[in-house]
């Protein structure tokens, strides 16, 4: 099956971008989602020096990894954070990305503002000229209690009314935050899904436990079949966030990335 399959550098939360690049390359991947999430994983970030950003770009080129997407999470309900997100859009363009990922609220910071769907759709609609200028697509991630299902995110994307704003379907977040079955929820929004965070879920629904893909309870064969049947060729970006304790060392992260690669190859995918 021909589909972009990447690894989110957030799998290497707590480790350097250099370590992430090395591990992702070693597992056989050709695509990477860079992480620029404030207060969490800042592998690349707008306040880094131009010299440092060029250094990262050169390392990606040397490794043969294509930075096709960037996680640039900001609270899109907070007008004070929109300027920060525009900087993230420009950073994504600098790296030549096609996609920028954001949750509606903050991913790992406290939300300083909330808004109803109509209001946040208006804020996002105002970003469309910036997305057009830099030829990017914004994919809204299923994340947080209020925005934890694809159904809700699809409603917001439709309110925005632009082909440049779609849904990033996180297969584990919809369980952890939304308390829904991903295969059931997907059918509520599949026409609006343009990107997938391929993340597995283990343990109880409300427990932070996101192992290597294929090691948890998500029914990926069914999920893949639904996408194929709908002709939805959205890119996959693997995200592994382990337990609340985190991975014990870099070797554990590298092994989880490799295990995920082997699982997808066994499912018929080409990296």
Regions picked out by a protein language model, each given a short descriptive name:
Residues 1-6, 66-73, 107:
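N-terminal small/glycine-rich loop or linker at the start of catalytic domains
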Residues 1-9, 13-31, 61-64, 96, ...:
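Histidine-acidic metal/acid-base catalytic patches
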Residues 11-13, 36-38, 73-76, 104-108, ...:
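Active-site-proximal loop/turn and secondary-structure-junction residues that shape catalytic pockets
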Residues 18-19, 31, 54, 59-62, ...:
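Active-site acidic/histidine proton-transfer and metal-coordination neighborhood
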Residues 30-41:
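A short beta-strand-loop structural module common to alpha/beta enzyme folds
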Residues 39-57, 61-67, 122:
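Active-site anion-binding loops
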Residues 44-52, 80-87, 112-122, 144, ...:
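Alpha-helix N-cap and loop-to-helix initiation/capping positions
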């Amino acid at each position: 099956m021909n589909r972009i399959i990447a690894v989110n550098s957030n799998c290497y939360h707590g480790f350097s971008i250099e370590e992430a690049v090395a591990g992702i390359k070693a597992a056989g991947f050709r695509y990477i989602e860079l992480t620029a999430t404030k207060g969490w994983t800042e592998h690349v970030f707008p306040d880094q020096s131009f010299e440092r950003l060029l250094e990262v770009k050169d390392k990606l080129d040397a490794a043969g990894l294509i930075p096709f997407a960037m996680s640039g999470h900001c609270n899109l309900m907070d007008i004070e954070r929109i300027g920060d997100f525009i900087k993230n859009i420009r950073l994504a363009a600098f790296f030549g990305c096609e996609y920028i990922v954001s949750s509606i609220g903050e991913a790992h910071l406290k939300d300083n503002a909330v808004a109803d769907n109509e209001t946040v759709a208006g804020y996002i609609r105002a970003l469309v000229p910036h997305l057009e200028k830099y030829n990017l697509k914004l994919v809204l991630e299923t994340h947080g209690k209020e925005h934890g299902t694809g159904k809700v995110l699809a409603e917001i994307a439709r309110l925005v009314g632009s082909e440049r704003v779609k849904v990033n379907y996180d297969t584990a977040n919809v369980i952890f935050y939304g308390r829904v079955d991903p295969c059931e929820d997907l059918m509520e929004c599949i026409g609006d899904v343009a990107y997938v965070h391929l993340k597995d879920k283990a343990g109880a629904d409300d427990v932070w436990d996101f192992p290597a893909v294929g090691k948890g309870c998500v029914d990926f064969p069914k999920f893949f079949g639904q996408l194929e049947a709908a002709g939805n060729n959205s890119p996959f970006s693997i995200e592994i966030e382990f337990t609340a304790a985190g991975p014990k060392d870099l070797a554990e992260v590298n092994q989880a990335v490799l295990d995920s690669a082997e699982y997808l190859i066994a499912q018929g995918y080409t990296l």
